[in-house]
Curated annotation (Swiss-Prot):
One of its GO terms (biological process) is translation. It comes from Pseudomonas entomophila (strain L48). Keywords: Ribonucleoprotein, Ribosomal protein. CDD domains: Ribosomal_L13. One of its GO terms (molecular function) is structural constituent of ribosome. This is Large ribosomal subunit protein uL13. Part of the 50S ribosomal subunit.
Amino acid sequence: MKTFTAKPETVKREWFVVDAAGQTLGRLATEIASRLRGKHKPEYTPHVDTGDYIVVINAEQVRVTGAKSSDKMYYSHSGFPGGIKEINFEKLIAKAPERVIETAVKGMLPKNPLGRDMYRKLKVYAGAAHPHTAQQPQELKI
C-alpha cells in the first residue's frame, strides 16, 4: 500500500467562523493555527496547504490570564536606529483588536512561503459582523 500524499489541486477547503468572545488568547490561537495548517484532517501533508479558512469574530472580547493584560508587550521596529516601538496588550486591544489574534496565530505557523499562504486564510474582525456570509461558514466551537 502506498503512502497517500495530498495534491494542492484536490484539497477541499471549508469555511469556519469562530467566536472569540471570552476565549483565552493562547488556547484559541493554537486551535486556529492547527486548523489553518490542516492537521485536523486525515489527508494532512506537511508540504501541502491542506487547511481551512477561519473567520474570527469578536476579537475585541478575547482575554488573557493573570497580569498579562498590562504586562504583555508587543514590539515592532521601523528599521531605523532607535526605531523600536512597544505597546502593551490593553492598549493594542483598544487600538487594533484584530492584531492581537493575528500576531498570536502568525507566530504558530511555519516561517516560510507555505506558512504565509496559510496565514492568508485567516480573517479576523473586531465585532460580530463579517463580510463572508456568501461562503456559508460553519460555526466552530473551541
